[in-house]
Amino acid sequence: MNKEEILKIIQELNEKQNETICIETKTAKAGKPEKYYDTISSFSNTMGGIILFGIEEKKQKNETTFKVVGVYDANDLQKSITNLCSKEFEPVVRPEINIVNIDGKNIVAVRIDVLNQRSKPCYYKPKGLHNGSYIRVGDRDDNMTEYEIYKCISYRENVKDDLMPVVRATMKDFDEKILGKFIENAKTNKPKLSEFSDQEILLNFGVLTEVEDKIFPTVAGIMVFGKYPQKFFPQWFVAAIVIPGFEIADLGEEGQRFDDNKRIEGNIPEMYEETIAFINRNMKVKVIISDKTGLRTDITQYPKDALREAISNMIIHRDYSQFKTGVYSMVTVYKDRIEFRNVGNLYGSNTIELLQTRKAMEVRNETIVKLLETLGGIIENRHTGISTMQKKMEMANLPEPIFSNEREDFVVTFYNGEYPELYPEELKEEQLDIEKTYEKTYEKILQFCVEERTAREIAEYCGYKGIDRFRRTYIKTLLEQGKIKMTIPTQPKNRNQKYIINN
């Protein structure tokens, strides 16, 4: 890095009055900082970043400033950083280090590149894998959860969760009709399979697995062909609800919390069909009669092809690992939108940008996908789901779908366009530049909260109507960082609760 680049970063930090998801500052004027290994780990595990040593962050009342103060000894600090990265991390971190003089003061700029997915997690060896692995969240370094560490290791070691045995299950737990159709299709598609027994076919396709000379159904087999998978996995269902308003806490005219509410169970094909039926009966349909032909055309509130893709992705590509046995998928129908919450965020090295192309992508549940392809009916085209959603929404003259890769979930949101004044245009940026959107919103909140504000006031000021999601995403984060505080801290859920910047 050169002087101009560093000065530009400092200027941006002063404008935002905050560090960012990829920029961290350390003073190091009087000596080596006591702790920065967490930032090296978090940058390596998240999206990379730059640590600037020799920058002082100073907080005064309503203002935070970043000032060049220089480091105690640039060469000694550089050696210390190099030794730390090469000896104390697994895997070894190879930083790019530059010493830049600004107004007679030395700045040590350390660039940390994000590791490829198969090398994660990067952890600080003295604290061990489970205590020394970090991830960057906003401007802070958080310990990775057990689940986040498991995702990295299972991906690296090519663990297939959908091939895990269901030891309590037997062949009697399969739906014979669906399984028979699958075997017939498999033999038709691959005539050589006619030479195999049915059990051999099921073993080859991953419907069954052999463990210590015993045959068990797999997770994939039970979820695709099971009579009642929830016998073994009670929480692997779809919770479908209709909210009589624009946010989860809104009540209807008669005080009802939900206009419709259903627990959708069964195997994957059954949950897929029932979820489609649930949405169909809870969305508006416009009927148009042609003046010329007299023929009737039904136009649904949301395009059916887009809905089918969102539902199939949510059920098929959810996380079926041991860490998510207690978590269900969720469809929430609001007045202005539908949200599909997929258990587990994007798999492996997939990104939102990659999802919007037709390039081959990594698949979390390869066996489930293969079984459904052979069975037919749900999966028709590989790797076109996201582009299909976008195309169908565009053809219906509806807002572009929103794809949000959260820490442990992946959320798809369709807006129906009936309340354009409520549609958060700013959310579009989230798909391409998460950091920009988040940091911009954080900045607006801090500027607005120089006076006491309610959560609704803050959300509306920032252009959001989904108060609950806004509270989880932004207000909670700023509270945890100590940048804002509650006016009634002893009663967090008090209806008169307000927020103000923390001086």
What residue ranges belong to the model's regions?
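Short amphipathic alpha-helical interaction segments
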Residues: 465-480, 493
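Short capping segments at the starts of secondary-structure elements
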Residues: 448-457
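Active-site helix-to-loop segments that bind/position phosphate- or nucleotide-bearing substrates
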Residues: 133-325, 330-336, 341, 347-361, ...
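Intrinsically disordered, low-complexity regulatory tails
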Residues: 91-171, 325-327, 383-387, 391, ...
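Flexible, glycine-/charge-rich segments associated with ATP-binding catalytic modules
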Residues: 231-238, 349-351, 357-443, 447, ...
